[in-house]
Amino acid sequence: MGGYGGVKMEGMLKGEGPGPLPPLLQQYVELRDRYPDYLLLFQVGDFYECFGEDAERLARALGLVLTHKTSKDFTTPMAGIPIRAFDAYAERLLKMGFRLAVADQVEPAEEAEGLVRREVTQLLTPGTLTQEALLPREANYLAAIATGDGWGLAFLDVSTGEFKGTLLKSKSALYDELFRHRPAEVLLAPELRENEAFVAEFRKRFPVMLSEAPFEPQGEGPLALRRAQGALLAYARATQGGALSVRPFRLYDPGAFVRLPEASLKALEVFEPLRGQDTLFGVLDETRTAPGRRLLQAWLRHPLLERGPLEARLDRVERFVREGALREGVRRLLFRLADLERLATRLELSRASPRDLAALRRSLEILPELKGLLGEEVGLPDLSGLLEELRAALVEDPPLKVSEGGLIREGYDPDLDALRRAHAEGVAYFLDLEAREKERTGIPTLKVGYNAVFGYYLEVTRPYYEKVPQEYRPVQTLKDRQRYTLPEMKERERELYRLEALIKRREEEVFLALRERARKEAEALREAARILAELDVYAALAEVAVRHGYTRPRFGERLRIRAGRHPVVERRTAFVPNDLEMAHELVLVTGPNMAGKSTFLRQTALIALLAQIGSFVPAEEAELPLFDGIYTRIGASDDLAGGKSTFMVEMEEVALVLKEATERSLVLLDEVGRGTSSLDGVAIATALAEALHERRCYTLFATHYFELTALALPRLKNLHVAAKEEEGGLVFYHQVLPGPASKSYGVEVAEMAGLPKEVVERARALLSAMAARREGALEEVLERLLALDPDRLTPLEALRFLHELKALALGLPLGSMKG
């Protein structure tokens, strides 16, 4: 049918005219309707085209000029992208949230009987990509979430075959794992999709594509997890045309690693910056391979709890630190490696291109050199047989597609060589023909040429027309020349075409056999990729350590850091190192704003995190406990869209700390309680400090509440960040020193921030008056206490007296604390 004015409907296409649709558009609509959730990119010659309302969507998304496809009885909007630029446009569309169905011409136009046959050859969604040009270097996870006996969460990276999952007890734990893995696409079980409140909250926290799939249980384990596994496999098979390369499912337990809640990952800027562009991962990422980069991210997601594996990692990093020439040699070779992990997947899916096999050959050529540097103990599999096969078979620089031809070396396949010789003889006939015909006809300008329309021809210029033999058959007349053919030329030409088709077919057969030979080594390639990724991370961490002066940490019961630094901040500006020593203590850190309290807290946590992935740390010396969790409450992170204030978010994060932190946890608290009144804030901060002290956590608590520094807690230690008023104003020394700060310097910081002079002076006057009143009130409290005879007070009088003392201490009118 023809056009319509409403929503896209099956069998219809937006446009104008009585119809019916021409055959090309009928074919387009039929394919489009098979994939209603996808944007169909429909090959027409050298372009992928969209028609109707999809053309309008494509034009809006990419800023393309909208044209029209016009036939006798119908006109429809049209927009397209050139096939040569497909990867760039597809990447943009996927990031915008489009699912793409790619319909290619599956037969040559010249061989088609009528309309060229087209089929959907690719379904592209953000979480199911295998195409190297479209994939990020990071892991590209598709996630599925189901409920039942807990929250079942499973991940699948279609590009590598990684398949894993976990069963979680709470929604907050679910969100932590999702934030840690950052999937590109998420499948929600029906009971979650139908929960509007959950979907709204989920979309706000995780702005990724949400998709649907059948959640039929598959595999073993708890029902919720089996449902999530089944959904991933069903969706991945649907987008991959049934072909899938997946490793055995791995059940993992987040509790087997250091606990890093979402708030900690955010506050410490492990993967995403709070401002600017710098992150811990960015500082550490000196990797040379894509699998190495993904492995480093995995280590940061899941720091280790056990000393043995950590010491083993540190030993390997230290070797590369000590042996600079070895480190440089290994890194130089690793830089030349292809992404063997993803290449192995494309081999198993039978999607590896000639250039993939060439990249595999170059990578395998590096393995003997690496073994020469590191010795056989490196454990790389023997792939020399495959390397020799690839060397013998592939030309140096093969084309992207098999259909382009010219990818198999001469001498590799006898049948192909025989066909090529026959073809060369056929070409030689035409080369010799020019000389023979020049001599026979006496036409010195005669030439043999070729074009796609007429094939081979003889060309004669105007001055020699009278010498053209009668047997020459004209095929084309130009301004000053004519073109001819001979019966024997057509016979020879047909034979050449036949040989070219046979050569192309044989090359494809040889290539497929070669790819199958490589596919059989896919597991060995994955093992090589795993070993090389570990080498890459060890060498990268060593490079960072040498370049920036890191040291190997030791593990013990105390936390002792000498000249510690913040690994990210020190890259941007001159940095003042600081010491810290504590053991199951509550350390209060006071000092003015901007002095560096938050940086000091963060650097301590980052040093601990680095140590527990097996990295050297930014310090002159470091001894650390093995922490079971790193918990933070740092910075304002209100959730206004969700109806939560800064204070509410702060209290939720503090509640998580109190729920989970143990005596083996590192806890960082920055200005807890500032989002409410000062009285409430002091009370909450005091109660929190007492609770964490009782729990024996390793706690660093930065605060402006000087009341906390006087708490009578046996394991409380006071530190302050040094600052001093000098003639030019307040000077920050960024040094952390023993004892509490003498004052908060709030007015001085306000002056530095540019508050008007009259406002600053008024603030100083008010501060002096308040301090005087407080001092006078305290003196009066002391006098009244000294004059008191407790033996003569009734219980009611004693209670009233305490209320009066508290009112005096707080500067309130007497009687205001009663009742």
From Swiss-Prot:
InterPro entries: DNA_mismatch_repair_MutS (IPR005748), DNA_mismatch_repair_MutS-lik_N (IPR007695), DNA_mismatch_repair_MutS/MSH (IPR017261), DNA_mismatch_repair_MutS_C (IPR000432), DNA_mismatch_repair_MutS_clamp (IPR007861), DNA_mismatch_repair_MutS_core (IPR007696), DNA_mismatch_repair_MutS_N (IPR016151), DNA_mismatch_repair_MutS_sf (IPR036187). Homotetramer. One of its GO terms (molecular function) is ATP binding. Residues 2-130 are annotated as: A1. Keywords: ATP-binding, DNA damage, DNA repair, DNA-binding, Nucleotide-binding. It comes from the Bacteria. Residues 571-819 are annotated as: C. Optimum temperature is 80 degrees Celsius for ATPase activity. Residues 131-274 are annotated as: A2. PANTHER family: DNA MISMATCH REPAIR PROTEIN MSH1, MITOCHONDRIAL, DNA MISMATCH REPAIR PROTEIN MUTS FAMILY MEMBER. Residues 275-570 are annotated as: B. This protein is involved in the repair of mismatches in DNA. It is possible that it carries out the mismatch recognition step. Binds double-stranded DNA. GO terms for biological process: mismatch repair. ATP binds at residues 591-598. Belongs to the DNA mismatch repair MutS family. This is DNA mismatch repair protein MutS. Pfam families: MutS_I, MutS_II, MutS_III, MutS_IV, MutS_V. The lineage of its organism: Bacteria, Thermotogati, Deinococcota, Deinococci, Thermales.
